[in-house]
């Protein structure tokens, strides 16, 4: 079926909107092989969004979110990130009651981890240093120079994919 789909980086699962525009999540995500969003393909990963850039040789991008607690509300409509107001108490008809507020979280950034096939093994990298570890020490100097000369940004999927293509052709 077709529905607007999004990935919730905080709860780490895919959500979609039904015809009444209510947000829902998949009850059996393991039954879904691939999600097609426009011309992009995503796998239902274990607590992660996995985009398939190329099947053979494998090149996937794993998206994860940096999260932190949302700023807490304080008096006069302000917010604070340093106040420690995590519990509350109140008077009820039967006595004193208390509890802990739910921790609200916000996404502060998105991390990209690249998953590739190197020979028969699957390897992951996320920056220049971890990319260079895919190669023997003798080749690392050459690839380090290539990355510096071409100003490869490991936050750009397109640039990293081109770097991977060049590296497997040599």
Task: Annotate the PLM regions.
Residues 1-123:
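Aromatic-patch recognition
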